[in-house]
Amino acid sequence: MNEEKKALVELMLGGSEAAFDELYRSSSKKLYRMAYFITGNRSDSEDILQETFVKCFLYRDKLREPERFEPWLYQILVRTAWRVEKRKKSRSELSFEGILDQEKDHLRAEWIQEDEREKGPLGAVLEAETAAQIRDALSKLDMKYRTVILLYYYNELSTKEIAGVTGTMEGTVKSRLFKARKLLKGILEAEDIVEGEKERGICHG
């Protein structure tokens, strides 16, 4: 967090509505996208966004460290989104249509690279895949796996921060990331978006 944003957070914590409004303007777009990727519903995402910021202001005294503002805000949003999704559990599939084309830059293969941020087996997505195809693949993941992928690769939170956001142990987050990457890789390979090991001529044993 830069010093300017930290100063705004400190002012907001002191009750400044002007600072709160500025934080809303600077953060709402990214938070809305996050809510949309979790729910796949624009109306729900707008409601989740509004509820997140209402809670942010009402419970601002619970934020002890200004530099922790973003993970704290994601915690509110993710848990609110999960609650909404649990209420609508009967819905069988999510639609991810209609996100702005500019999302493509945010949805590249770096989401699904290895922990060390080196180019992993899904690196071909960077050149070969579109945002829409990746969104479709993500929509097929269970919500808990989709969420950790988004928080880690898209929002660039650490596994420790994600643990705080999701209310789980850091080891659980790492396990979910590993499984999510494996599942996502399988989906992309099954749809011929990236090559599997057999197609690349790789064999084991």
Residue ranges and their predicted role:
Residues 78-82, 134, 145, 154, ...:
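DNA-recognition helix of helix-turn-helix
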Residues 24-25, 32, 42-59:
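Conserved RNAP core-binding helix
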Residues 9-33, 37:
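A short, charge-rich alpha-helical start-of-domain segment used by transcription regulators
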Residues 1-2, 7-11, 93-97, 133, ...:
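C-terminal edge and immediately downstream basic/flexible tail or linker adjoining helix-turn-helix-like DNA-binding
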Residues 26-29, 37-38, 141, 150-157:
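Short helix-capping/turn signature of helix-turn-helix
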Residues 33, 47-54, 67-79:
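Structural recognition of an alpha-helix C-terminal capping motif at a helix-to-coil junction
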Residues 5, 10, 14-17, 89, ...:
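Amphipathic alpha-helical segment used for protein-protein interaction
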Residues 58-65, 78-96, 104-105, 127, ...:
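Arg/Lys-rich amphipathic alpha helix in sigma70-family domain 2
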